A protein has these predicted regions:
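Non-membrane alpha-helical secondary structure
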Residues: 3-7, 31, 35, 58, ...
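Generic detector of well-ordered alpha-helical segments enriched in charged/polar residues
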Residues: 9-13, 37-40, 114-122
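Amphipathic, interaction-prone secondary-structure segments
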Residues: 36-90
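Acidic, proline/glycine-rich low-complexity IDRs
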Residues: 102-162
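Alpha-helical protein-protein interaction elements
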Residues: 1, 75-78, 92, 127, ...
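Short glycine-rich, low-complexity/disordered patches
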Residues: 20-37, 44-62, 119-139
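Short, extreme N-terminal segment that most often corresponds to the first beta-strand
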Residues: 1-34, 154-162
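Type-3 copper protein
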Residues: 92-96, 100
Length: 162
C-alpha cells in the first residue's frame, strides 16, 4: 500500500507518541523481524539476487534496511528500503536516503523495479511512504530537545537514529 498527501500526514501525526520515541507501545520486535526477513526473501526472489541488509539497528526509530544491488535492477543503481518501527511504514530511496528529490527519483527509477518493490512490500503489509515529505521540519509532539540533530525532521522521527 502506498500513501501520500493528507493521508500521509494524518498517519504520521497519529503514530507520533512522545512517550515512545524509538518504537510504539506494545512493539513486537520478533514479529517485526519476521516481517522484515520475509521482505528480504521476497526481494531476493523478485530480483534474483542476494540483497544486503542492515539488521543491527539500535537507538533508532527504524527497524532495518535492505538494499537491492544495482546489478540486479533495471534502474542500474542500488534501491534501498528502510523499514520503520512505527505503523509498518517503509520508504524507498535511490542509492541512499536523501540523495535524490522526488522528481529525480521518478525520472531515474525503472518502472519494472517499482512494480517488484511495490508487490513485495504489499505482500508484507508494509505502507510505502514517499521519502521527500519526510525531510520536512518535524512539528509533532516530541520535544525538539530529544533529537540529536539541531533541525529535527519527520525522517528522523520515523526512519533514523534518535
Amino acid at each position: 500500500m502506498r500513501i501520500d498527501g493528507v493521508r500521509l500526514w494524518a498517519l504520521l501525526y497519529e503514530l507520533d507518541d512522545p512517550a515512545h520515541l524509538e518504537m510504539p507501545q506494545g512493539f513486537d520486535w520478533e514479529a517485526a523481524r519476521r516481517q522484515f526477513d520475509g521482505l528480504v526473501a521476497r526481494f531476493n526472489s523478485a530480483f534474483q539476487t542476494t540483497c544486503a541488509t542492515d539488521r543491527s539497528i539500535e537507538d533508532a526509530s527504524y527497524h532495518a534496511e535492505v538494499t537491492v544491488p544495482s546489478d540486479a535492477t533495471a534502474t542500474g543503481a542500488d534501491l534501498v528500503v528502510r523499514v520503520s518501527n512505527f505503523g509498518n511504514l517503509a520508504v524507498l530511496a535511490l542509492e541512499n536516503p536523501g540523495a535524490y528529490d522526488q522528481e529525480e527519483f521518478d525520472a531515474l527509477v525503472h518502472v519494472s523495479d517499482l512494480t517488484r518493490i511495490f508487490e513485495c512490500l504489499d505482500e508484507g503489509d508494509y505502507i510505502l511512504v514517499p521519502e521527500e515529505p519526510l525531510w520536512a521540519p518535524y512539528d509533532g509532539r516530541v520535544p525538539a530537545s530529544v533529537f540529536l540533530q539541531s533541525k529535527p525532521s519527520w525522517w528522523i522521527r520515523y526512519f533514523d537514529y534518535l
